[in-house]
Amino acid sequence: QMNKITRPPVGGWQQPIRALYEVKVPGRKLKSFIDPQHDVTTEDVRLAHREGFVSVEHLKRYTTLGMATDQGKMGNIIGLALMAEALGKEISEVGTTTFRPPYTPVSIGALRGRSVGRHFRPLRRTPLHEWNLDHAGTMTEAGLWQRPWYFARDGETLADAYVREAETTRRTVGLCDVTSLGKIAVQGPDATDFLNRVYSNAFAKLAIGKARYGIMLRDDGLVMDDGTSWRLSETEYFMTTTTAHAAPVMAWLEELLQTRWSDLKVHVTSVSEQWAGIAVAGPCSRTVLEACVEDPACVNNGNFPFMGVIETVLKNHIPCHIARISFSGELAYEVYVPSDYGPAAMDLLWGVSEPMGGCLYGLEALGAMRIEKGHVTGAELDGRVTIEDAGLGRMASTKKSYIGSVLRKRPELTREAAPRLVGIFP
């Protein structure tokens, strides 16, 4: 089947990511530093073992590992892993050294510098940042990210540019950088049960190779976030969140697994940095994908239905995941490739789209098209909105219990006179 997801084994759900403490090159002796403050190398740790220093405290004093200002926060775990390997033990059996204050890092800003300006928090750029700038993109802040606001032509104003982008997308095809969306890997035998408890709508019967749009509520019954989750296998999902709520949603999922449902066999891992995302939207979007993938049949209407998910390869040998998802009302797809391949994938898609009369579009046009469709935007999800306010009350399940399922039924949150989000036809 074209839409069947296949992947190599990764060691079971309990070891989705293997630990790597040292990069070794056969036939070469590398000098690898593990404590840059005191110039401690991997060979220093092995020398300590050969000299008979088997205690971690002896290792620390022989090599000065972890005796600098960071008190081992940077390199100790690697040193302990190498010592454990030399002793033939587990890291937990080797033990740790005694840490001295500060036990946790102290921000330099807490000691000096009261005016921080734009340095108050980091500014994140997508793998397509330079590509967008090279194609006349005007950037704006979205959460912590820099994203294209609009792509002006020949001195266009913001209003001129976003109207043209929206009209072109609805008429032919448009490409949009959506890398900033939060991306979370949900893995484990109980992953389906976990998502079914977190989302207000049903996920228990979601088939492999399909995606579903979900609404996540807080305990008080108000909307926390929305996004899609793709089922990649029996035990693995790929969840997307809004840009602004990526970190809060990740923290919320971790809290639920650690404090409420610690019996569930589930791991959640942020993979936002690992994938570059490109939305391909418009009546000609399928034609663009057919010209860009190695097997055009995998994206035809019969093999790739609405909310379907496939794993395929682009013509420039780039592996990718594609979901048939639309947030603008048109036929649309989301294409995710490994981050380093983002510019190359965009070059390929744009090389096909531009001759067809397609365009690049930014957040302003995306917001306009979402409003026309009646789909919630970031402005609506401000922590004071109910699922009924968002016009999505019918999605909420009446057959299961989920986070916020009780308090969302409070009279004040379900009154008929409350404002409702509706679509505006273009």
Regions found by a protein language model. Give the residues of each.
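Well-ordered mid-protein domain cores that form the structural environment of catalytic cofactors
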Residues: 202-256
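Conserved, structured C-terminal
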Residues: 125-129, 133-134, 147, 233-235, ...
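Cofactor-binding beta-sheet edge motifs in enzyme active sites
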Residues: 22-40, 46, 68, 145-148, ...
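Residues forming the flavin
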Residues: 1-123
